[in-house]
Amino acid sequence: MLSFVDTRTLLLLAVTSCLATCQSLQMGSVRKGPTGDRGPRGQRGPAGPRGRDGVDGPVGPPGPPGAPGPPGPPGPPGLTGNFAAQYSDKGVSAGPGPMGLMGPRGPPGAVGAPGPQGFQGPAGEPGEPGQTGPAGSRGPAGPPGKAGEDGHPGKPGRPGERGVVGPQGARGFPGTPGLPGFKGIRGHNGLDGLKGQPGAQGVKGEPGAPGENGTPGQAGARGLPGERGRVGAPGPAGARGSDGSVGPVGPAGPIGSAGPPGFPGAPGPKGELGPVGNPGPAGPAGPRGEAGLPGLSGPVGPPGNPGANGLTGAKGATGLPGVAGAPGLPGPRGIPGPVGAAGATGPRGLVGEPGPAGSKGETGNKGEPGSAGAQGPPGPSGEEGKRGSPGEPGSAGPAGPPGLRGSPGSRGLPGADGRAGVMGPPGNRGSTGPAGVRGPNGDAGRPGEPGLMGPRGLPGSPGNVGPAGKEGPVGLPGIDGRPGPIGPAGPRGEAGNIGFPGPKGPSGDPGKPGEKGHPGLAGARGAPGPDGNNGAQGPPGPQGVQGGKGEQGPAGPPGFQGLPGPSGTAGEVGKPGERGLPGEFGLPGPAGPRGERGPPGESGAAGPSGPIGIRGPSGAPGPDGNKGEAGAVGAPGSAGASGPGGLPGERGAAGIPGGKGEKGETGLRGEIGNPGRDGARGAPGAIGAPGPAGASGDRGEAGAAGPSGPAGPRGSPGERGEVGPAGPNGFAGPAGSAGQPGAKGEKGTKGPKGENGIVGPTGPVGAAGPSGPNGPPGPAGSRGDGGPPGMTGFPGAAGRTGPPGPSGITGPPGPPGAAGKEGIRGPRGDQGPVGRTGEIGASGPPGFAGEKGPSGEPGTTGPPGTAGPQGLLGAPGILGLPGSRGERGQPGIAGALGEPGPLGIAGPPGARGPPGAVGSPGVNGAPGEAGRDGNPGSDGPPGRDGQPGHKGERGYPGNIGPTGAAGAPGPHGSVGPAGKHGNRGEPGPAGSVGPVGAVGPRGPSGPQGIRGDKGEPGDKGARGLPGLKGHNGLQGLPGLAGLHGDQGAPGPVGPAGPRGPAGPSGPIGKDGRSGHPGPVGPAGVRGSQGSQGPAGPPGPPGPPGPPGVSGGGYDFGFEGGFYRADQPRSQPSLRPKDYEVDATLKSLNNQIETLLTPEGSRKNPARTCRDLRLSHPEWKSDYYWIDPNQGCTMDAIKVYCDFSTGETCIQAQPVNTPAKNAYSRAQANKHVWLGETINGGSQFEYNAEGVSSKEMATQLAFMRLLANRASQNITYHCKNSIAYLDEETGRLNKAVILQGSNDVELVAEGNSRFTYTVLVDGCSKKTNEWDKTVIEYKTNKPSRLPFLDIAPLDIGGTNQEFRVEVGPVCFK
């Protein structure tokens, strides 16, 4: 399209050339006469008065330049060209005849009358330029200009459609391995390892925090009689009795009960290392230690399983062949991520049912007295108790009411004789006498017998929080908690440089121990494997917290217990004696009764390893004894025959690395096509579903006890053992003197796990103590799960091309290809038989998105292949170098395009597939519902005292009772001053052999055993389940270069590129010629009267007459020797032509304006609605005319412009199809195309009025090129016909299919790029009423729209009707 400036320039060129031509013609028609001689100069006459205006004479010679005049006023508007210069009158006069001969000189004449006005003087110098006048009116349209020069090349067009995929080339050489991939997602936990041997006793755990006090248990049944209590406090001294006679010496009394244990003596000297004791029983596995510090990166692991074949990638450009590097091994597995944060404490559970009554525990240390609880509510009145023995006289009560009149007293002494009076009547009751004096307190009565147990009081209110209790004994190990959820993956570390391949690393750490399996039958003793390599030294740990107080040395053996002497009378307390020297250790006495359990002692130092004794003969089996303590770990028995598979055990700790087995013999090569030998072990698959429980194997005979093996890694905590039977009650030892309470020591190092202490009475709940200082770092935890694969090593050298591997697993279908060229519709193919349902393959990872391939036509279904066994995944090849680009193959013979095959009948449901892989652990579920109410809680604490009972009758005074029983021991008194050292006691009898001490710390490793014989080969294991699908392999090697294909057909012409930037400015043009004369200016102001000049000389002969009348035509006469722009001409001969030029310019300007700002009319259509919207943003959405292919406007189309969305919408013609109901289908369950089959081949059309189908197709093609998005909806009106979802079945198998413009079929489900969406679905059930389903399809591939046809399925039945309403297609 020519720009406005270009057109205007062409027009001016044309006008200018026309003016030049006219000028040359005019110049040729005027003859120039000969120049006459110059006359003499006359004298200057006096200046006469100013005469009248004379007739214009010939122009005189040029005068001297005048001074520049002031700027003139603005002239009237010029013509559009601004080049209409005026020709000046300045020049030689035209037309004078030849000059006559000179006459004789006459006498001076008289002063003549004033001469006529002189001719107009020459024009002065140009004045200052005036202000620019307003733009003139637009001139008429000029003739079309010459074609302009080629514009700058446009921007490159959009890439053409992808060409046909060539045949696969031959396999290229292996490429260099790619850079290391990103760290993969953490894999699933591997399968549980086999159960490991029981580990050695774990290190004693730190004392657990004291548990909260439990709720009081129900009152147990009456216990057995308790041990003999401690000697009570001395009773009050009785009155001294009279000395009895000395009795005979009695026999020696029995050995008195042992007093309470004395306070620990001073530490004895460190004893010599004792012989190595028998291996202690395997203690319960300690809790899992905290994660150790990250170890050094392990060595490179073996290569993983080969991945499944990836999708065919896009053909790469030919790369330069690289130098083959050394083959890299996969990097080591990374360290596990950090342990996740501990979860929040869960809500307190409901009260559980009361457990069975436990066996009576040993008496615990007495707790500190708790603070008094709040007073409980009064209990109910108790039943009336038995009559108590007479109590002590009470204190005097308040005065009672007056008693009845007493009986007459005893007769008094005779009074003086009175006069005899008359006997009066009985007197009234006298007033109350004064109270008597309070009598002395009576003796205390005997304590009454205990009353019956009152009924259970109501639970008291909670008491105040008591003081923090002393640290209780270590509780039994708790049952293992459920494993916590896997923590979140740690942040990804920065990628390191690729290292050189390291040597093959040692085998992994031992697996975690599983549950104890049934003992196998005894097998032959296997040879010990060779020692494993020492691991690399770990990095130094961080500076630990300051250690606690060192261990106390072991206590010396107990001295002899002396016999108790006869009890003497209590003397006064003597002064403490000085401390005697320690006595020598006596021989051990016989076993005394079992004492109370003392607090656990601190660990002694480890003794040296003693020699292993010879094994004695096996004794006959004795009767089953009580459950003893766990025995020492025996040597592994010989392998028994494999029992049937047990239930899956809990995940065990990693096992000790086994020795490398000898290489087996190479098997014979199998036939091609069967699966090859197993590849290298792949990455751990997902955890499979648990297998069925195997039957219990027979119990194997016990193997011979082997030498004690080195302690294994710390095991996970074992399950809680059964409670052992209570030991016999020991006698109380003599009480030691109480020592001063020592200052609380710092937290000691972790001691060995003590035996379970006796359960003390439940103390009051202590206040939460402050957090203790951080303990020292724990021992190294068990080896964590394997980390993710390390980075790829240096590329290996390219290997030779191997034989073709077995067929890979069929990949998922590729994305639809690009649309092929439209072929002729072929005949419909036969329906293939239904294939057998294949096994459900594991879903492959998403392939790389391929370029859009051509849409293939549905072929006939081939016969089903038998499902081959799943091949083992080969090792991944290293990434090959990209092969050189293949030559294009010969074009294949164009096959006839068949009709789209009908949709096949839905096949029968496939056989149940194998169980899928176990998914990753789910997230923690929501908290469950509250459990049912628990059983009644145990008895509460005793209630407050009941209300006082009714006052009993006063008892008789009792006899003085015997001395009361000793009261309960009072609280511990404060520690008395240290006594003086006592004399050295006599050696006591030898104690019995003490119980087996706690297992000492691990002794030094024993000498290495000799290598055992090679074990028998194990039985062949059952064939494993098929492995899970491996990870994607590395990208396959590029194929060899294919042949070059033929030159593809030229793509469609791309849309016009955006307008290029303005070119550089051209050189400045030559000065234009002067324009036409301007219009006549206004008359100048009349000049002032000049002064009269002196008389001049006589003038020359008179001038020739005025010129003749102009000869017509364009008056560019010869007078126009010079162009001037400021001298108006008086002749009006130019004006009519000026108007023609002006009108032409104006018309041309209007046409250019309409090109730049289209009006959307049929004569002046826009290209798209977007152009209209940009030109007229104020316009409203409506119907307008557009011409997408530009050029002639005869094929413009009328569309609806939606200015709110910027869309150009084209209506279908017609919009509605008539209702259809009489179509009988040839085959049931087939989609039937409405336009192709039912309407006899007429598809939806989008013709605008006055435009043919071919012209409309061209306009639509341009619209698709100009748009980058398109959308359209279609409404399916139905009566008893399903359009999308069938509500009865919930399936979409009856949904309609739509055909797009490029023959693509748009469906209800499948590839999301070819599925439509449903806005309203009223046709989902059959109601005998008309309803509708509105379908919409939006795409960024405008080539797929508009819809050309629709294929419903659920039609043709009785009382079924449908019609279609096609919505507009909108491009944007």
UniProtKB/Swiss-Prot annotation:
Principal location: secreted
Annotated glycan sites: K183, N1273
Disulfide bonds: C1169-C1201, C1209-C1370, C1278-C1323
UniProtKB keywords: Calcium, Collagen, Disulfide bond, Extracellular matrix, Glycoprotein, Hydroxylation, Metal-binding, Pyrrolidone carboxylic acid, Repeat, Secreted, Signal
GO biological process, one term: bone mineralization
Motif annotated as Cell attachment site, chain positions: 783-785, 828-830, 1011-1013
Tissues expressing this chain: Forms the fibrils of tendon, ligaments and bones. In bones the fibrils are mineralized with calcium hydroxyapatite. Expressed in flagella of epididymal sperm.
Post-translational changes noted in the entry: Proline residues at the third position of the tripeptide repeating unit (G-X-P) are hydroxylated in some or all of the chains. Proline residues at the second position of the tripeptide repeating unit (G-P-X) are hydroxylated in some of the chains.
Any one Gene Ontology cellular component term annotated for this protein: extracellular region
Low complexity compositional bias, start-end: 95-146, 231-260, 285-299, 306-327, 336-348, 390-416, 476-495, 519-537, 600-639, 674-716, 725-743, 755-771, 792-801, 855-882, 891-927, 957-978, 987-1007
Gene Ontology molecular functions: extracellular matrix structural constituent conferring tensile strength; identical protein binding; metal ion binding; platelet-derived growth factor binding; protease binding; protein-macromolecule adaptor activity; SMAD binding
Entry-annotated residues carrying 5-hydroxylysine: K183
Binding residue positions for Ca(2+): D1187, N1189, Q1190, C1192, D1195
Classification via PROSITE patterns: NC1_FIB (PS51461)
Positions of the propeptide segment: 23-85, 1126-1372
Endpoints of the signal sequence: 1-22
Transmembrane portions of the chain: none
Residue span(s) of domain Fibrillar collagen NC1: 1139-1372
Keyword Cell cycle (UniProt): no
Residues found modified as Pyrrolidone carboxylic acid: Q23, Q86
Notes on the domains: The C-terminal propeptide, also known as COLFI domain, have crucial roles in tissue growth and repair by controlling both the intracellular assembly of procollagen molecules and the extracellular assembly of collagen fibrils. It binds a calcium ion which is essential for its function.
Subunit structure comment from the entry: Trimers of one alpha 2(I) and two alpha 1(I) chains. Interacts (via C-terminus) with TMEM131 (via PapD-L domain); the interaction is direct and is involved in assembly and TRAPPIII ER-to-Golgi transport complex-dependent secretion of collagen.
Family assignment from sequence similarity: Belongs to the fibrillar collagen family.
Role summary: Type I collagen is a member of group I collagen (fibrillar forming collagen).
Protein name per the record: Collagen alpha-2(I) chain
